[in-house]
Amino acid sequence: MTLAIPLELSLFDPTSADFLVPLISFSAYFSVKSFTMRPCPRLLTRKLNYPGHIPLSPAQNALLAVGSGVVGVLDVTRGDLIASLSESTAGIFLPALHEKMKMTPEGRQIMKDRPEITNKTIEKLKELKRGTLGREYVEWLGGGGLEPESRAPVQYIDSPLLAYTMLRYRQTHDLYHTLFSLPPTLPHELSLKVLEFSNMSLPVALLSSVFGPLRLKRKETWTRDWVPWALRTGREGRSLVTVYWEKRWEQGIGELRRELGVERNDAEGVEARWGGYRKIREVERELRRKGEWVDEPEDW
């Protein structure tokens, strides 16, 4: 006879993108000869508030935060874990972020329309001129081999309204990269996390900003070159989550930066020390010289 022991916690492999699923969605049963999982009836009886919603108890939410945080804040390239961490800590900041959106006419219109950026969206943007927000967003995605729908869906937030707020932040993150000409590499992802914390007070951005640099080979150089710029830009610029990006696809990206009160990092020597950033800026300069860039009132 084998003895099966129900466990609310399960063994997991932190290298797997799905390692948290047994932790929050199943009761695991161990025996001498086998390990199996079956749905937990207690979870299946909970109300689902939107498609894909996975309701969690407070204890499960805490475990999700710890499990995703241990790995996610050390490796910000693990988008699945960062997504889980941001949702499990959402109760701390999402209501405030939602209130920020309600404070501006543009933000209120976003919450009313609830637009989503999908793969179909970018097909329409490929015909725009270089230098427009929409076209540069397409170029940025293509350069990194990314697409809008590669972002993880929102699952663990109970309120449909706050779930959309999280989705909006998640879907527009790559537009922040585009706005500041930041490539999808670890140093620049961390720079953007610092900026997001300064701009929106996101806890997950703070955690990534504190622990993520431990993995950098040039920590001191990164700190000197990027942290002051990110903190200043996030603090002085408009709240990025309140921007209705879809209505600005055809706007010159330099003009948009001026409107939002933000600038790219033009500190002395930064381009020389960061090749990925330099490459994006050089492509832009070459297109400007050829007259193939939307004319903008911005130094380049």
Curated annotation (Swiss-Prot):
<keyword id="KW-0472">Membrane</keyword>
<dbReference type="GO" id="GO:0006744">
    <property type="term" value="P:ubiquinone biosynthetic process"/>
</dbReference>
<dbReference type="InterPro" id="IPR027540">
    <property type="entry name" value="Coq4_euk"/>
</dbReference>
<keyword id="KW-0999">Mitochondrion inner membrane</keyword>
<keyword id="KW-0831">Ubiquinone biosynthesis</keyword>
<feature type="binding site">
    <location>
        <position position="177"/>
    </location>
    <ligand>
        <name>Zn(2+)</name>
    </ligand>
</feature>
<protein>
    <recommendedName>
        <fullName>Ubiquinone biosynthesis protein COQ4, mitochondrial</fullName>
        <ecNumber>4.1.1.130</ecNumber>
    </recommendedName>
</protein>
<comment type="function">
    <text>Lyase that catalyzes the C1-decarboxylation of 4-hydroxy-3-methoxy-5-(all-trans-polyprenyl)benzoic acid into 2-methoxy-6-(all-trans-polyprenyl)phenol during ubiquinone biosynthesis.</text>
</comment>
<comment type="similarity">
    <text>Belongs to the COQ4 family.</text>
</comment>
<keyword id="KW-0496">Mitochondrion</keyword>
<feature type="binding site">
    <location>
        <position position="174"/>
    </location>
    <ligand>
        <name>Zn(2+)</name>
    </ligand>
</feature>
<dbReference type="GO" id="GO:0005739">
    <property type="term" value="C:mitochondrion"/>
</dbReference>
<feature type="binding site">
    <location>
        <position position="189"/>
    </location>
    <ligand>
        <name>Zn(2+)</name>
    </ligand>
</feature>
<feature type="binding site">
    <location>
        <position position="173"/>
    </location>
    <ligand>
        <name>Zn(2+)</name>
    </ligand>
</feature>
<comment type="pathway">
    <text>Cofactor biosynthesis; ubiquinone biosynthesis.</text>
</comment>
<keyword id="KW-0456">Lyase</keyword>
<dbReference type="GO" id="GO:0031314">
    <property type="term" value="C:extrinsic component of mitochondrial inner membrane"/>
</dbReference>
<keyword id="KW-0862">Zinc</keyword>
<comment type="subunit">
    <text>Component of a multi-subunit COQ enzyme complex, composed of at least COQ3, COQ4, COQ5, COQ6, COQ7 and COQ9.</text>
</comment>
<dbReference type="InterPro" id="IPR007715">
    <property type="entry name" value="Coq4"/>
</dbReference>
<dbReference type="Pfam" id="PF05019">
    <property type="entry name" value="Coq4"/>
</dbReference>
<keyword id="KW-0479">Metal-binding</keyword>
